[in-house]
């Protein structure tokens, strides 16, 4: 018979600020490394003579590993304990960051980026699970905690290009990876004060499910990235897409029969859960893909320096900070549905405003979508995350958060692959890719808003 395990943080033992601050470090470093790399792509390309497809792999190697392993990490958190997994993730991420900074060619950098993704995949679900279990007794406090945690990640992903531009200006692109190490050390040391979360030591581990999910996502991303280089008529491309679809079906069949699946399909019986997962997919795919193309646009089309390009992204940081502060207050007053719909509406307007981008567009015109897009994201994401956790039992919070973040990271990798492929072909292709990414993103957000309006019940 299992003995009850103490909750992640005993009430009144550790302060609200300490728990949120410690767990947020994981989201900060993991999200920072999504966007900070984008601003360094031209410099990395020069150092390693890398074309756009290799640059896509440098970005997507991280997000693929992140997405592939996060489902297992959610189950591992439920199995081993969230605190333990959080600490392990911080250690792996720190070592991988040092390796990225010391990499000697594109292949070595891609390899260490995979290791970074493994570290991130263990940190994120465990940190969110710690938050959920720490404040499960107080919905308002849990909402505030998740909003602040989300805000930290949102601000870091928006601040990544700015920090990257400054570090490259002061030193070189390698510093964008070394900067993670102090954050990781702080997270490791602070995590020792957290109490362990509820565990389920008798829970199994779904190895067949993990392997088929890894093959499914990797085959899909590889086919999309190499599409421009090889052409769709190449059997590697259409064969890869067909193979990925077959493996997805096999994965779902395995999960349906598995005793301890990494993707519990019964969670998808909830309409709330389904529309929120779809929304997370759309938001990440749109944002990651668009920022990737905008980074190329700023430096390869508008000819901004790394520092100028980084500073040009400053409105994204400002927009995230403002909207996240507003989001928690709106949730406390209106629940989750209204802030989500408001955020999606603002995001739609922001992506449509990006259609003005041309080869000679002045920055003051770009400023408008640059601040509106993150404001929409910042309003919508915290209530989305809160709603996901509110729709599952406390003991399944690790798995639920892993599903949310897995699908979001997978969507981010696909967004970079698709939008990046459209940008492969010089300045004209990059400008065209921005317009297409804006239309696709706006369309996805419109669909999300309609689904949220129809199905989501406030929590």
For every predicted segment, state its role.
Residues 78-208, 394:
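Helix-loop-helix hairpins in multi-pass membrane proteins, especially solute transporters
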Residues 147, 169-279, 304-305, 311, ...:
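Hydrophobic transmembrane-helix bundles of small-molecule transporters
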Residues 40-70, 108-110, 307-312:
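Extracellular/periplasmic helix-loop-helix junction of adjacent transmembrane segments
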Residues 18-60, 123-124, 128, 291-295:
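Extracytoplasmic
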Residues 16-29, 37-39, 235-243, 247, ...:
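12-transmembrane solute porter fold
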Residues 60-74, 124-128, 314-326:
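Central cavity-lining transmembrane alpha-helices of secondary-active solute carriers
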Residues 43-45, 74-75, 79, 166, ...:
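Membrane-interface helix termini in secondary transporters
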Residues 47-49, 81, 102-108, 171-172, ...:
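Helix-breaking motifs and short loop linkers at transmembrane-helix boundaries and internal kinks
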């Amino acid at each position: 018979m299992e003995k009850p395990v103490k909750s992640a943080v005993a009430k009144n033992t550790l302060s609200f600020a300490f728990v949120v601050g410690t767990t947020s470090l994981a989201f900060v470093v993991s999200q920072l490394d999504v966007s900070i790399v984008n601003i360094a792509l031209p410099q990395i390309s020069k150092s390693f003579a890398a074309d756009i497809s290799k640059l896509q792999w440098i970005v997507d190697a991280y997000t693929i590993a992140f997405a592939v392993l996060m489902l297992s990490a959610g189950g591992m958190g439920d199995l081993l304990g969230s605190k333990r997994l959080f600490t392990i993730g911080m250690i792996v991420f720190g070592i991988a960051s040092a390796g990225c900074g010391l990499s000697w060619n594109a292949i070595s950098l891609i390899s260490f980026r995979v290791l970074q993704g493994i570290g991130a995949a263990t940190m994120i679900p465990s940190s969110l699970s710690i938050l959920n279990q720490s404040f499960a007794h107080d919905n308002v406090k849990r909402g505030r905690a998740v909003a602040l945690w989300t805000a930290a990640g949102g601000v870091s992903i928006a601040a990544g290009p700015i920090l990257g531009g400054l570090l490259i200006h002061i030193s070189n692109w390698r510093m964008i990876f070394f900067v993670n190490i102090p954050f990781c050390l702080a997270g490791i040391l602070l995590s020792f004060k957290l109490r362990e979360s509820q565990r389920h030591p008798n829970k199994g581990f779904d190895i067949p499910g993990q392997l088929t999910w890894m093959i499914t996502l990797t085959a899909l991303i590889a086919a999309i990235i190499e599409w421009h280089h090889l052409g769709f008529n190449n059997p590697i491309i259409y064969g890869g897409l067909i193979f990925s679809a077959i493996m997805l079906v096999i994965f779902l069949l395995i999960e349906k029969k598995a005793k301890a699946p990494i993707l519990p399909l019964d969670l998808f019986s909830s309409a709330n859960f389904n529309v929120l997962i779809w929304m997370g997919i759309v938001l990440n795919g749109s944002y990651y893909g668009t920022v990737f193309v905008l980074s190329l646009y700023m430096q390869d089309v508008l000819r901004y320096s790394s520092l100028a390009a980084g500073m040009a992204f400053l409105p994204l940081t400002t927009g995230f900070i403002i909207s996240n502060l507003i989001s928690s207050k709106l949730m406390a007053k209106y629940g989750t549905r209204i802030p989500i719909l408001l955020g999606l509406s603002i995001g739609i307007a922001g992506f449509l405003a990006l259609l003005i981008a041309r080869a000679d567009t002045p920055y003051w015109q770009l400023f408008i979508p640059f601040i509106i897009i993150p404001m929409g994201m910042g309003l919508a994401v915290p209530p989305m995350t809160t709603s996901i956790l509110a729709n599952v039992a406390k003991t399944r919070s690790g798995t639920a958060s892993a599903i949310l973040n897995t699908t979001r990271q997978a969507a981010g990798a696909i967004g970079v692959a698709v939008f990046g492929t459209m940008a492969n072909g010089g300045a004209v292709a990059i400008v065209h890719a921005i317009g297409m990414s804006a239309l696709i993103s706006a369309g996805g957000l419109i669909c999300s808003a309609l689904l949220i309006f129809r199905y989501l019940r406030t929590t």
